[in-house]
Amino acid sequence: GKNTMREIDCIRQRIDLGSDTYANGKISNEKMDDLCHTLKEFAQIMESYKVIAYKAYGTSAIRETENTLILQDQIEQRTGIRVEILSNSEQRFLDYKSIASKGETFRRIIEEKTAILDIGGGSIQISLFDKDTLVSTQNLRLGVLRLQELLNHLNAGSTQMEQLVDELATAQLDDYKKLYLKDREIKNIIIVDDYLTT
């Protein structure tokens, strides 16, 4: 229909800002330059398509820096793009909204006991649905980049890495199971991620 959104192009560029944030609490000048350069290119693409409205969001990599507001201002001054910083719950809401846009298929799946695992750079959000209702949602600080930086900080050799990740994940997941999963049997798992797929 007339008011339906249609994808014309899909352009992606990965910049792992979180690896700086989770290690030092700051984003390096080099990564900031990369980000601003990329956003300028996106601004040019939007201009060529005559885009009249856009949304640019920042998540935990920017939210958890020591100077979030300064970064926001610097990005806007250098690129003309205003980045809105999302809270964890706002970010997850948008992710779930995109899944729910799949319509009847999504509703049918979450009628049964379903876990949505939202895997990000800073954390994993586990949300449980049953009978078409959100039962619980919990954030575990087991994101891909956060774990990577922790392993780098611990100077873990490749043989130790798997064991350390297993220990960290098992400890948090065991606590999660005791507190939230209890005796629920999960029928479906939906994975939302930026890191597992290419």
Q: How should each PLM-predicted stretch be described?
A:
Residues K2-I116, S127-T198:
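Nucleotide/phosphate-binding catalytic cleft detector across ATP-hydrolyzing
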Residues G122-Q125:
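Acidic, divalent-metal-coordinating active-site segment for phosphoryl/phosphodiester hydrolysis
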